[in-house]
C-alpha cells in the first residue's frame, strides 16, 4: 500500500549545434556520473549529473556540456552507442558498419572493426568481459573487449527464398532487433524474425553467453518494436506484443529463461488500440518498469509496479508527440529517472515511495486513473482489493487528503494537468459504499496550474502546492493552453470552492472550482511540504539541504524556530511528517524527517541511523501524538514515547536501535521483532485500537498490536475512567486483568469499583475479572519492563502494598454487585466467585449463602420472584466446587456442623458414598458436643475442639488431656476453660512436664511450684543451674540443716564445674562456711579484690599470703604474655606491609599489561604458614578463617568444608586473602572488656598488698601491648585504602606515639591506674 511520488524534477537543455539536429542515443558513465548523448549530426555531448543538483529550482537554461564530433563519412550515421567503463571510452557503431572506440579524455577516435551490413545494436555484458553486437544482416556477433570474435549466430529463421532485409534498409528508427543481458551476464536474450505460415513473426531466444548455445526460445508472437528488457534480478524478460485477432492496446508480457510466458498486462485501456510502446526500462532494484507509450495525441512516460499479482500504473508524465521522449533509469539510484527529448531537453526526476495510508488509517492506492479506497479501521484489505474506487479522466499523479473537523476531502492531481476533488461522508457510513465506483469530474480552473510536484491541504478550502512551469511536458497539460509567461518552480495557494451542497452519507465528486490566490517564485528546490498541526493554516517547507522553514497562509516563508534554534535536518529528507505533541500542557510541533540512507531526525537532531519507515500513534482523540513508531533495517519495531524524545531520554544514534541477539531478553521491551524481513510500516490505528499496520515484501497486510501501545491505551482509558473500554482491551489482547487494578494502585480502584461494575455490565466478564485477581503488582513483575505514563488525579498515583489487595478488591466488587446490580442468578454466582477467590477463600460464608437458598427451596416458598433471582442451590454449589478444591469445600461444610450440607457437597463433588456416608452417619449418632469435637479434630481446629470436649462433660476429661498434651499450645486455654481445682493441678503438672521435655527448666520449675510439686521444681532448678532456686525450694520442703549443708556442697561443686567459680565461692562462704575454699574459688575467678576482702575479713595471714602469691604469679605470667603479644603484633604488621607492598606493585604491573589480578599466581610468595597463638586471657582471638584458606575450586563438598574449619586458624602466605586475614587477626588481638576489668582488679590487689613495683611493671607492659595493637590496626586501616605504602608516612613508631598521647584518656585505657601512668 504505497504510492510513487515525484518529489524532485530538474529540467535542463542541451544547446545543440543546429535546429535540425536531434538527440538519438544516450549512454551512462557510472564511475564519473556522466551522461553521453549522440545526435543525428554525429556530435557527442557529455553532461555531469551533478550539474542538475547545482541548478536552481526549475531553472530552464542551457547546460554546460562537453562536445566532440565523431568523424565519419558523409552519409554515414550513428546507429549504436554505448559506454565501456573498462576502456573509459565510448563504443560507436555506424550504418556503414564502422565500429569505433572514442576515448573521452583524449578526444581520440579509433576504428576497431568494420561490420558487414552495418551495426544495428551494441550491448556490453554487465560483467564487463563480453560485447554483443547485431548487424544489419541479422547476425549476432559476440566478442571480447580485445575485439576477438567468440562466435557468430543467425538471429532469424528465414528459409531459402524467404524475405531478407536489405542492408540499405537499415535506419535509426527501424527497430526490430535488440540484445538484453541477464544481470549476472551468464545469459542474454535476443529477438529474431521467423518466417512462419507465409508471414514474418518474431520470437525471443535465450543464449548462453560463454558458448553461444541456444538455451530456449519463446513462441512466435507479433512482438512490436523489438523491445526486450531483462530484469536485473534475472527473474523476468519484458517484451511488448499485440494479441492475435485483438484490436485492443498492446500488452507487456513477461517471459522466463525457459522461454515460457509467465504473465502479461495491457499498457492502456482495452478499447484504446492506438497506443503503442516505444521503450521499456527496468530500474536497478527490479521493482519498477518504465516505458514510453505513444498515444493518439501525446507520448507518455509510464511507471508500473508489481504487487500481489497485479501491475499498478503508479505514474504517468505526458509529453508532446513531437518531443520524442526517451527514458533510462540511473543505474545507481533505483528511483531516479532520466528523460530526454529529441530537442535536447534533459530532465532528472527523483521519485520516492510514500505510504498510501493516511493519518486516519484510510488507504488511497493509485492505479492508473483509479484510486482504490480502503478504510483499514474497518477491514485489512490489501490491494488490488478495495472497499470502493474513484475513477478520473486521466492517470493520477499525486493526491492530498484532508481529515479534520469532521471533514474528509481528497485533492487529486491528474496527468493531464487537471485537479479533481472529492468530499467523503462520515467514516462510519463508508460500509454502505462497498463495491461502488465513483466517477470524479475535473474541477473548473481558469488559470494555468502548471505541473504539481507537491500538494498539501492547509484547510478545507485551501491547498498549498509546488508547481513547475516551462517544461516541455507542460504543453500536454490541459491548463497549459492558458497563456502564461511563468518559468521555474512556484509555491502557490489554490482556493477550492464547491458549488454543490454536500449530501450527507454521499460522495461529492463534482461542482468544485479551483483558483490560484497566492504565488511566489522559489529560488531553491522544495523537497517536501508538511502540515503544521499546532498552528492554523500553516505548514513547513523543506528545501534542498534539509533546511525547514515555516509558511503561513498567503504570506512569505518565514524561518521556523524551535527552542530558538533553526530547524535544519542533517541531510535532505524526502519523507517529512509533523506530529503535534504535548509538552507540559503546551502543544508543540515535532518535525520528523527521514532521508534515503535511513537517518531519522527529530527537530534537526539525529535520532536513528538505520530507520526503514516510521509513523505516529495517538492514544487520544485530540490529534496529539503520544508515540513514535520506528521500524529499523534490522526488522525491529521500536515504540518510542514522544515525551522521552522531547526530554532527550532517548539515546541518539543507531546504537540504541540495534539489538544484540544475545542480549535481547535484557533490553527494554519497547520493541517488537518483525518476522517478515523487509516489511514496512504503512500506518497505525490510533486510539484504543493500538495497532501498527505492516506491509510485507509479498504485498499482504499484517496488523500487529505492540504490547507497549496496548498498555498505553489501557492506561489512557483508565485515566478517563473508561473501565469498559479498558476491560475490552485487556480481554482482547490477553493482558493480565490485574493491570486494571495495579496501574493506579488498588486502593484507588476501590473508589471506582461501582463505576467498574456498572460500565462492564456483564456479570460473566466481572466473574472472569474476579478469577484473575492475585496478590502482586503486575506493573512491577509481569510488565516491569514497560514504562507506564500515569494520568489523572494524584490519588490515582498511589502504589500500595499487595498484601491484602485481593480481599479488598473483591470485597469492593461484591459490595458494588449487591448494591447496584439487580438480583439475578448470575449476580449470585458472581458474588460467590468473589467469596471463593478471596485470600483466604471465604468458603464458609459462601456455603452459608448456598444454605440459605437451600432452606428457601425446602420451605417451598411461594415467593417466585425471590426464586427467580437466585440460582438453585445445586447450581450454586457446583459453581463453588468449580472454583475451589472439593475437599476444602467439604471440610468447610463440616466446619459449619451441617451434616446435610456436607453430604450434598460430597455428592456434587462426585465422591464415592462409601467414603463419606459411614463417617457422616457415625457423626449423626453422637451427642452434639462430641460431634463438634470430632469434626474439629478432623479439621484441626484444636481450640474449638477443646471448647467442645470440655463442654461435653467430666467424663471426657481424659480425652481433653490427650488433646492438650498432643497440642501443647492449648495449655493456656485449657486452664481457662477447666474450672475444677483438682483438674487444673493435673493440667499444670502436665504443662510443666511438657516444659521439661522442651528443656525450658526455669519455666517448668515455676509451673511445678504452681501445682505444689516441690521435688520436681527443685530438679528443674538444678537442671538449669539456678542454685539459688534449689536452695529456696529446699527451704519450702523444710529440709534439715545437715541436708541443706550437703546440698550446698553438691551445688558448689556443680557450679564450679559449670565455669562459675565466683558463684561457687558465694555458696562456699555463705552456706558451707568454707573460707579457704571460697578464697581459692575467688582467685580462680580472678576476683582479686573480693578475695583480698574476704581474707582481711577473717584476719588470717596464711590466707592473705595465698592471695598475694597468686596475684604475683598471675602478674608475672601476664607480663610474659603481653611481651609475647607485642612481638606478634610487630610480626603480623611487618608481614602485612610486605604483602601490601607486593600487591600494589603487581597490580600496577597487571594494569600496564591489561591483565586481571585474579588470574595471577603469586609465585614469589612464601609457602610458609603462620599460626595464631591463643594469646592471653585478656585478648580476643578471632577464629574466623581467612579468605586464603578457601579453595578457588567450584567443588564444595562437606568434607572439604570441615577441613577448612580445622585450618581456619592459619593464614596461607601468598594467598589472595592474606592481607585482610592479617588485618582481622590484628583486630582480634585487642583487649576485651572483661580482661580490662580483671586486669584493673589485679592491679588494685597488688597495690593493696604493697607490690607497687609489680603492679607498675604489669601496667606498663599491658599498656605497651594495647598501644601497639591499636596503632597497628590504625596503620593497617590507613594503608588498605592507599595506592602506595610510603615507609615514612606509614611508620609504626609514629602511630604508636600518636596513640599513646591521644588514647590514654579514652575509655579503652580506663583500666589503667593514674598513679602508674608515665609522663
UniProtKB/Swiss-Prot annotation:
**Pfam families per the UniProt record, alphabetical:** A-sol_ELP1 (PF23925), Beta-prop_ELP1_1st (PF04762), Beta-prop_ELP1_2nd (PF23797), HB_ELP1 (PF23936), TPR_ELP1 (PF23878)
Stored SUPFAM superfamilies:
Tricorn protease domain 2
Compartments (UniProt record): Cytoplasm; Nucleus
Name the tissues where it is expressed.
Expressed in meristematic tissues of in roots, stems, leaves, seedlings, cotyledons, guard cells, floral buds, flowers, siliques, and shoot apices.
Identify the stretch(es) annotated as Mediates dimerization: 884-1319
Q: What happens when the gene is disrupted?
A: Narrow leaves and reduced root growth that results from a decreased cell division rate and a reduced apical dominance. Increased abscisic acid (ABA) sensitivity and drought tolerance. Higher resistance to oxidative stress mediated by methyl viologen (MV) that blocks electron transport during photosynthesis and by CsCl in light. Accumulates anthocyanins.
Q: Which InterPro entries has this protein been placed in?
A: A-sol_ELP1, Elp1, ELP1_b-prop_2, ELP1_N_b-prop_1, HB_ELP1, TPR_ELP1, WD40/YVTN_repeat-like_dom_sf
Name by which UniProt lists this protein? Elongator complex protein 1
Species assigned in the record = Arabidopsis thaliana (Mouse-ear cress)
Question: What gene name is listed for this protein?
Answer: ELP1
Amino acid at each position: 500500500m504505497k504510492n510513487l511520488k515525484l518529489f524532485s524534477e530538474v529540467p535542463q537543455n542541451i544547446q545543440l549545434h543546429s535546429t535540425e539536429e536531434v538527440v538519438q542515443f544516450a549512454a551512462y558513465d557510472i564511475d564519473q556520473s556522466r551522461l553521453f548523448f549522440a545526435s543525428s549530426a554525429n556530435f557527442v555531448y557529455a553532461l555531469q549529473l551533478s550539474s542538475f543538483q547545482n541548478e536552481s529550482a526549475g531553472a530552464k537554461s542551457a547546460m554546460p556540456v562537453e562536445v566532440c564530433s565523431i568523424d565519419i563519412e558523409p552519409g554515414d550515421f550513428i546507429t549504436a552507442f554505448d559506454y565501456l567503463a573498462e576502456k573509459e571510452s565510448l563504443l560507436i557503431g555506424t550504418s556503414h558498419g564502422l565500429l569505433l572506440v572514442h576515448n573521452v579524455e583524449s578526444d581520440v577516435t579509433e576504428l576497431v572493426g568494420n561490420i558487414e551490413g552495418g551495426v544495428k545494436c551494441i550491448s556490453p555484458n554487465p560483467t564487463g568481459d563480453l560485447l554483443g553486437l547485431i548487424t544489419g544482416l541479422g547476425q549476432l556477433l559476440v566478442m571480447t573487449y580485445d575485439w576477438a570474435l567468440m562466435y557468430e549466430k543467425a538471429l532469424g529463421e528465414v528459409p531459402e527464398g524467404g524475405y531478407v532485409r536489405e542492408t540499405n534498409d537499415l535506419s535509426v528508427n527501424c527497430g526490430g532487433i535488440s540484445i538484453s543481458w541477464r544481470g549476472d551476464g551468464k545469459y542474454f536474450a535476443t529477438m529474431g524474425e521467423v518466417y512462419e505460415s507465409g508471414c514474418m513473426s518474431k520470437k525471443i531466444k535465450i543464449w548462453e553467453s560463454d558458448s553461444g548455445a541456444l538455451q530456449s526460445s519463446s513462441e512466435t508472437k507479433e512482438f512490436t518494436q523489438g523491445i526486450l528488457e531483462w530484469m536485473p534480478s534475472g527473474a523476468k524478460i519484458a517484451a511488448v506484443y499485440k494479441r492475435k485477432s485483438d484490436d485492443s492496446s498492446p500488452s507487456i508480457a513477461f517471459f522466463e529463461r525457459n522461454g515460457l510466458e509467465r504473465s502479461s498486462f495491457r499498457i492502456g485501456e482495452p478499447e484504446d488500440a492506438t497506443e503503442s510502446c516505444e521503450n521499456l526500462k527496468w530500474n536497478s532494484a527490479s521493482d519498477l518498469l518504465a516505458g514510453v507509450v505513444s498515444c493518439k495525441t501525446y507520448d507518455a512516460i509510464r511507471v508500473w509496479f508489481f504487487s500481489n499479482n497485479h501491475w499498478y500504473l503508479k505514474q504517468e508524465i505526458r509529453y508532446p508527440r513531437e518531443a520524442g521522449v526517451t527514458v533510462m533509469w540511473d543505474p545507481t539510484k533505483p528511483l531516479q529517472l532520466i528523460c530526454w527529448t529529441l530537442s535536447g531537453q534533459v530532465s532528472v526526476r527523483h521519485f520516492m515511495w510514500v505510504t498510501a495510508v493516511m493519518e486516519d488509517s484510510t488507504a488511497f492506492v493509485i492505479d492508473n486513473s483509479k484510486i482504490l479506497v480502503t478504510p483499514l479501521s474497518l477491514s485489512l484489505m490489501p490491494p488490488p482489493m478495495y472497499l470502493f474506487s474513484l475513477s478520473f479522466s486521466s492517470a493520477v499523479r499525486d493526491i492530498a487528503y484532508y481529515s479534520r473537523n469532521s471533514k474528509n476531502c481528497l485533492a487529486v492531481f491528474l496527468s493531464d494537468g487537471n485537479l479533481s476533488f472529492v468530499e467523503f461522508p462520515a467514516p462510519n457510513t463508508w460500509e454502505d459504499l462497498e463495491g461502488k465506483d465513483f466517477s470524479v469530474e475535473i474541477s473548473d480552473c481558469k488559470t494555468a496550474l502548471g505541473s504539481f510536484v507537491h500538494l498539501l491541504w492547509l484547510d478545507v478550502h485551501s491547498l498549498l502546492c509546488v508547481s513547475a512551469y516551462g517544461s516541455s511536458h507542460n504543453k500536454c497539460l490541459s491548463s497549459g493552453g492558458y497563456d502564461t509567461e511563468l518559468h521555474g518552480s512556484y509555491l502557490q495557494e489554490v482556493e477550492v470552492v464547491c458549488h454543490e451542497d454536500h449530501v450527507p452519507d454521499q460522495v461529492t465528486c463534482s461542482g468544485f472550482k479551483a483558483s490560484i490566490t497566492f504565488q511566489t517564485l522559489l529560488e531553491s528546490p522544495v523537497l517536501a511540504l508538511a502540515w503544521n498541526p499546532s498552528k492554523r493554516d500553516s505548514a513547513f517547507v523543506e528545501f534542498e539541504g534539509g533546511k525547514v522553514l515555516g509558511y503561513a497562509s498567503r504570506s512569505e516563508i518565514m524561518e521556523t524556530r524551535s527552542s530558538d534554534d533553526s530547524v535544519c535536518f542533517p541531510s535532505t529528507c524526502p519523507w517529512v511528517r509533523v506530529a503535534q505533541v504535548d509538552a507540559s500542557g503546551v502543544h508543540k510541533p515535532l518535525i520528523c524527517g527521514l532521508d534515503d540512507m535511513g537517518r531519522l531526525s527529530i527537530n534537526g537532531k539525529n535520532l536513528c541511523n538505520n530507520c526503514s519507515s516510521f509513523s505516529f500513534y495517538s492514544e487520544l482523540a485530540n490529534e496529539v501524538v503520544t508515540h513514535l513508531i520506528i521500524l529499523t533495517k534490522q526488522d525491529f519495531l521500536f515504540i518510542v514515547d514522544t515525551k522521552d524524545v522531547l526530554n532527550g531520554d532517548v539515546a541518539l544514534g543507531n546504537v540504541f536501535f540495534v539489538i544484540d541477539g544475545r542480549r535481547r531478553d535484557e533490553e527494554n521491551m519497547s520493541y517488537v521483532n518483525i518476522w517478515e524481513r523487509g516489511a514496512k510500516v504503512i500506518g497505525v490505528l490510533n486510539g484504543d485500537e493500538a495497532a501498527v499496520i505492516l506491509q510485507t515484501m509479498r504485498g499482504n497486510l499484517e496488523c500487529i498490536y505492540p504490547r507497549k501501545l496496548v498498555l498505553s491505551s489501557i492506561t489512557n482509558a483508565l485515566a478517563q475512567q473508561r473501565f469498559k473500554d479498558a476491560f475490552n482491551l485487556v480481554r482482547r489482547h490477553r493482558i493480565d486483568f490485574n493491570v486494571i487494578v495495579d496501574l493506579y494502585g488498588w486502593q484507588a480502584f476501590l473508589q471506582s469499583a461501582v463505576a467498574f461494575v456498572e460500565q462492564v455490565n456483564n456479570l460473566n466478564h466481572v466473574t472472569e475479572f474476579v478469577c484473575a485477581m492475585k496478590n502482586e503488582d503486575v506493573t512491577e513483575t509481569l510488565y516491569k519492563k514497560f514504562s507506564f505514563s500515569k494520568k489523572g488525579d494524584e490519588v490515582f498515583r498511589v502504589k500500595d502494598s499487595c498484601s491484602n489487595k485481593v480481599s479488598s478488591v473483591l470485597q469492593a466488587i461484591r459490595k458494588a454487585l449487591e448494591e447496584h446490580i439487580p438480583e439475578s442468578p448470575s449476580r449470585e454466582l458472581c458474588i460467590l466467585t468473589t467469596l471463593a477467590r478471596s485470600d483466604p477463600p471465604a468458603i464458609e460464608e459462601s456455603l452459608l449463602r448456598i444454605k440459605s437458598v437451600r432452606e428457601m427451596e425446602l420451605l417451598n416458598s411461594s415467593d417466585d420472584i425471590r426464586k427467580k433471582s437466585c440460582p438453585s442451590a445445586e447450581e450454586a454449589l457446583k459453581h463453588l466446587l468449580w472454583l475451589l478444591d472439593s475437599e476444602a469445600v467439604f471440610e468447610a461444610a463440616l466446619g459449619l456442623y451441617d451434616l446435610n450440607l456436607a453430604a450434598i457437597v460430597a455428592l456434587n463433588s462426585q465422591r464415592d458414598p462409601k467414603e463419606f456416608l459411614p463417617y457422616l452417619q457415625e457423626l449423626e449418632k453422637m451427642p452434639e458436643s462430641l460431634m463438634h469435637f470430632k469434626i474439629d479434630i478432623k479439621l484441626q481446629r484444636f481450640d474449638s475442639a477443646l471448647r467442645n470436649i470440655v463442654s461435653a462433660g467430666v467424663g471426657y476429661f481424659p480425652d481433653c488431656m490427650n488433646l492438650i498434651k498432643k497440642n501443647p499450645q492449648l495449655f493456656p486455654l485449657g486452664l481457662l476453660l477447666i474450672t475444677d481445682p483438682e483438674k487444673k493441678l493435673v493440667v499444670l503438672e502436665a504443662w510443666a512436664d511438657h516444659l521439661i521435655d522442651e528443656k525450658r527448666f526455669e519455666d517448668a520449675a515455676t509451673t511445678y511450684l504452681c501445682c505444689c510439686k516441690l521435688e520436681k521444681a527443685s530438679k528443674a532448678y538444678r537442671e538449669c543451674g539456678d542454685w539459688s532456686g534449689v536452695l529456696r525450694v529446699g527451704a519450702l520442703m523444710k529440709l534439715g540443716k545437715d541436708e541443706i549443708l550437703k546440698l550446698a556442697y553438691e551445688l558448689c561443686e556443680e557450679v564450679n564445674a559449670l565455669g562459675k567459680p565466683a558463684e561457687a565461692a558465694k555458696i562456699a562462704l555463705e552456706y558451707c562456711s568454707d573460707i579457704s575454699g571460697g578464697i581459692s574459688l575467688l582467685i580462680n575467678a580472678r576476683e582479686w579484690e573480693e578475695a583480698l576482702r574476704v581474707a582481711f575479713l577473717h584476719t588470717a595471714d596464711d590466707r592473705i599470703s595465698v592471695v598475694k602469691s597468686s596475684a604475683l604469679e598471675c602478674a608475672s605470667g601476664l607480663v610474659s604474655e603481653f611481651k609475647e603479644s607485642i612481638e606478634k603484633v610487630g610480626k603480623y604488621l611487618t608481614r602485612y606491609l610486605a604483602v601490601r607492598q607486593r600487591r600494589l606493585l603487581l597490580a600496577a604491573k597487571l594494569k600496564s599489561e591489561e591483565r586481571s589480578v585474579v588470574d595471577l599466581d603469586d609465585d614469589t610468595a612464601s609457602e610458609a604458614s603462620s599460626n595464631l597463638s591463643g594469646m592471653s586471657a585478656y585478648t580476643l582471638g578471632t577464629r574466623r578463617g581467612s579468605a586464603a584458606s578457601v579453595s578457588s575450586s567450584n567443588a564444595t563438598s562437606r568434607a572439604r568444608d570441615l577441613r577448612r574449619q580445622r585450618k581456619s586458624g592459619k593464614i596461607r602466605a601468598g594467598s589472595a586473602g592474606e592481607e585482610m586475614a592479617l588485618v582481622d587477626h590484628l583486630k582480634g588481638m585487642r583487649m576485651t572488656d572483661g580482661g580490662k576489668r580483671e586486669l584493673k582488679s589485679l592491679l588494685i590487689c597488688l597495690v593493696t598488698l604493697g607490690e607497687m613495683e609489680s603492679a607498675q611493671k604489669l601496667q606498663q607492659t599491658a599498656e605497651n601491648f594495647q598501644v601497639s595493637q591499636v596503632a597497628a590496626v590504625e596503620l593497617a586501616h590507613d594503608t588498605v585504602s592507599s595506592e602506595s605504602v610510603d615507609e615514612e608516612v606509614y611508620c609504626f613508631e609514629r602511630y604508636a606515639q600518636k596513640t599513646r598521647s591521644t588514647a590514654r584518656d579514652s575509655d579503652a585505657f580506663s583500666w589503667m591506674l593514674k598513679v602508674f601512668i608515665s609522663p
